[in-house]
């Protein structure tokens, strides 16, 4: 899995600049180096309409000044940023501002790199289910949760033949809960989780055959199957016999 993530980040590094532009100024970034615990990122700011010299400011969230550079030609200002894996999304939000004799440009759109730099594929998908009896017959209640994966994560209830029966996007870290009448599907069903990086599926859960569903309805309604009932009756008889012998031996 670690190798897969490194390959993903290497692909991001090989791609061109990701760019946002507003009010005459452009902010872009490119991943230069990928390390197991950090990234080296090049952020560029460009205000092509500003007269030279141009003073570029790289701002973090809440307008905090990160770096400043004066440019005397038409080349965009470049800023090298080292980012560690412990960096929070707040610290990976940047914007640019430029000032010159012709005025002030920006701030630019906010550049948020967290999802792209630290994205993790969905994994460790757990699916738990219970059978319940309702007014309209037996239903399957399924709970799906991926232990790992970058948000947002979309969960799907998939039925026989790959048909999507239901879909949810709960809050991150919360499970998706599905309820499905047994009469609406046959064969099997499973849970599927997907984010921007990948897809993961749970093991297939087989559904009872048609002839077994009538028995299932009776069981879920509170009636004991025949075999357990006989065992319980036999146990009660045995207890009664033992109790009678004990009373006889004490002379009561």
UniProtKB/Swiss-Prot annotation:
Q: Which GO terms describe its molecular function?
A: cytokine activity
Q: Where in the cell is it found?
A: Secreted
Q: Which InterPro entries match?
A: Ig-like_dom_sf (IPR036179), Ig-like_fold (IPR013783), IL-40-like_Ig (IPR040878)
Up-regulation conditions: Up-regulated in the mammary gland upon the onset of lactation. Up-regulated in peripheral blood lymphocyte B cells upon activation.
Distribution of this protein across tissues and organs: Expressed in bone marrow, spleen and lymph node.
Establish whether keyword Nucleus is in the entry: no
* Keywords for this protein: Adaptive immunity, Cytokine, Glycoprotein, Immunity, Secreted, Signal
Protein origin, superkingdom: Eukaryota
Main subcellular localisation: secreted
| GO CC entries | extracellular space
The residues that carry sugar chains are: 82, 177
What SUPFAM superfamilies does the entry give?
Answer: Immunoglobulin
What the record says about disrupting the gene is: Mice are viable and reproduce normally. Show reduced number of both peripheral lymphocyte B cells in the spleen and precursor and mature lymphocyte B cells in the bone marrow. Show smaller and fewer Peyer's patches, lower numbers of immunoglobulin/IgA-secreting B cells and an altered gut microbiome. Exhibit reduced levels of immunoglobulin/IgA in the serum, gut, feces, and lactating mammary gland.
GO annotation terms (biological process)? adaptive immune response; mature B cell differentiation involved in immune response; positive regulation of immunoglobulin production in mucosal tissue
Endpoints of the signal sequence: 1-18
Pfam families the UniProt entry points to: Ig_C17orf99
What is the role of this chain?
Probable B cell-associated cytokine that plays a role in the regulation of humoral immune responses. Involved in lymphocyte B cell development and immunoglobulin/IgA production.
The entry's protein name is Protein IL-40
- Organism of origin: Mus musculus (Mouse)
